[in-house]
Amino acid sequence: MLTILQANPATRRRYLALRVALLVHIVLALSLVCLAQTEQTPASSKPADGKPLTSDERAELLKLIKSLQERVDKLEAAQATQAPTTQTPATSLAPQSETKYDPSTSDDPHVWMEPVVKEKPVSEAPAAASYGRYTPNLGYKLANTEYGDMSVSIYTYARYLNQLGLASNYTDSFGNVKSVQERQDFQLQKVQIKFLGWVLDPKLRYFLYTWTSNATQGQGAQVVVAGNVGYTFNSHLTLAAGITSLPGVRSTEGNFPFWLSVDSRHIADEFFRPSYTSGVWVKGNVTKRIRYQVMLGNNMSTLGVSASRLDNKFNTLSSALVWAPTGEYGQGFGDFDDHQTLTSRLGVHFTRSDENKESQPNSDNFENTQLRLSDGTVIFTPDLFAPGVTITDATYRMMDIDGGLKYRGLAIEGEYYWRWLNNFKFLTEPTQLQRQQVPQSLFDHGFQLQASAMIVPKTMQFYVGTSRINGQYGKPWDIRSGVNWFPWKNKVVRWNNEWLYLYKSPVGYSSVPFALGGKGSVFHSTLELAF
């Protein structure tokens, strides 16, 4: 009985109609019995009004009622067994869906931080196909409703690093001898947990993450909890705010982790590039083949820097304009996608920022960048150019041009950088003699060049690369060679082995395989998981 009462409205209406019909049937039966008894009474007998029924009459009525009750019980039992069957189609039907843009098919390098919105349910009714769906590098679908969706994605890698081939010390351009740490260790290097999706409207998207670098245990920015939120008005304009990388070079456009090496740049790219900061930005397509991104931020690197250490100028500006003549270039470096026709790209980047000594991060924090001379010395170092002279402020300007070609698993990609540092301010006003020892401006330029080939399509990739910095205080360079194995023929799991040779590296910290001032060979082997 409870099952029937809990059924849907249509079932309850059928049940009530059945009960009414049975009651009418009982009343008619009783009337027929009484009529039959009346007809059997002799004509000379007195009316039976007011007399109780005889024992035979009562027995006949009870027998009839019992028979009707048994029929009611059987009908109720049959109705109860049919109720779940009638409800099954209603619960098993998936909600209608509206096809949405799938960013995993885009050549936009920012798609790794965009949610997958393949289907938008019309109702909140459960749909098995909407939950647990997996999209490589964009994770598993946790929720999918008409009011929003959420996916979870994890990126991590374990690395063996051997720097024993490096010289134990180096001499900077000012004659100072400094030591080089020669590491050999194994680290679960980085763990990133990402939550991404949309809320209320598929155009309103969020990207939240926790990010840790275990090699920098104890550092101020060893663990980062960050993210951003944006609204896409159309294909030409997305407005967003939060923490992201300044798009000053190709590797900071948003294509991480789709690099040839695992989470490791060439030293020239590391030397010139900006880093992550808080701010606002716009991006979109100018045409189908030209896209742009412009960001206004706090400083060049916010990791490990509190708001109390920032200046109040809010004048860090970075931009990227990318042209793909064929309309599609693909994510990241190398031709894993095996383009069957020649595809190319050309990018132009520009960044400027007024930097202050207080707004600079600690030098060993991961993913940070600092203003350095080409020998690796931070320009805010006290007494750097002359005794008693300390630079506290400087203006950073950097222009970058990159280009690339891809064809049938082969790729060649290069980048050139120009950087200017000027508008120096000092802790104390230098004397005329001291000013003669301090350069009015600094100019450095350099390049990186990488070539790669898919030896076995979707499985084995070989690459080589080199970079060089032409600076006023040194001309460091590096070369590297490596191989990537993709055992499942996708970018979810990768085993990378790489050898590199450093010559007076001007950059380096515990999160990367190269060391500051390093000269010599380095080997590292890395197992990467990105789902």
Descriptions of predicted regions:
Residues M1-L18:
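N-terminal secretory signal peptides that target proteins for export/translocation
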Residues L2, C34-Y157, L164, R289, ...:
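N-terminal periplasmic/intermembrane-space "pro-region" immediately following the signal or transit peptide
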Residues R19-S31:
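Bacterial N-terminal signal peptides
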Residues A125-P126, G165, H339-R352, N356-F531:
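Outer-membrane beta-barrel pore domains
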Residues T135-D172, V177-T302, R309-Y329, F333, ...:
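Outer membrane beta-barrel
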